[in-house]
């Protein structure tokens, strides 16, 4: 009995963990070049609301302005 119960613990932990992660994921949008958009955070807030976070992903060149924001209820998570 103890062995059966312990073999169920790990799958249950993973199910709970993945259920919580899905609820906390947001949406993401790429706005353009950080060379053109000088205030990436401000632009994200103006487009997606006060809970949006913007940052410049400097993967090369002038970088890319990326926004992370809460998904609308009708839009699926990524």
From Swiss-Prot:
GO cellular component terms given for this protein? extracellular region
Q: Which GO terms describe its biological process?
A: defense response to fungus; killing of cells of another organism
What's the superkingdom here?
Eukaryota
What InterPro entries is this protein classified in? LCR (IPR039641)
- Swiss-Prot/TrEMBL keywords: Antimicrobial, Disulfide bond, Fungicide, Plant defense, Secreted, Signal
Q: Where in the cell is it found?
A: Secreted
- Provide the leader sequence positions: 1-23
Disulphide bond pairs: 27-71, 34-56, 40-65, 44-67
Q: What is its main location?
A: secreted
Q: Could you tell me which PANTHER family the record lists for this protein?
A: DEFENSIN-LIKE PROTEIN 171-RELATED (PTHR36788:SF3), DEFENSIN-LIKE PROTEIN 183 (PTHR36788)
The record's similarity note reads: Belongs to the DEFL family.
Full protein name: Defensin-like protein 171
Whose protein is this, by species? Arabidopsis thaliana (Mouse-ear cress)
Gene name of this polypeptide: LCR61
């Amino acid at each position: 009995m103890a062995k059966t119960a312990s073999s169920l613990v790990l799958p249950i932990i993973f199910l709970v963990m993945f259920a919580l992660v899905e609820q906390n994921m947001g949406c993401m949008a790429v706005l353009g070049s950080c060379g053109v958009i000088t205030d990436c955070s401000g632009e994200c807030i103006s487009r997606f609301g006060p809970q949006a976070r913007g940052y410049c992903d400097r993967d090369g060149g002038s970088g890319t302005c990326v926004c992370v924001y809460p998904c609308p209820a009708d839009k699926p998570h990524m």
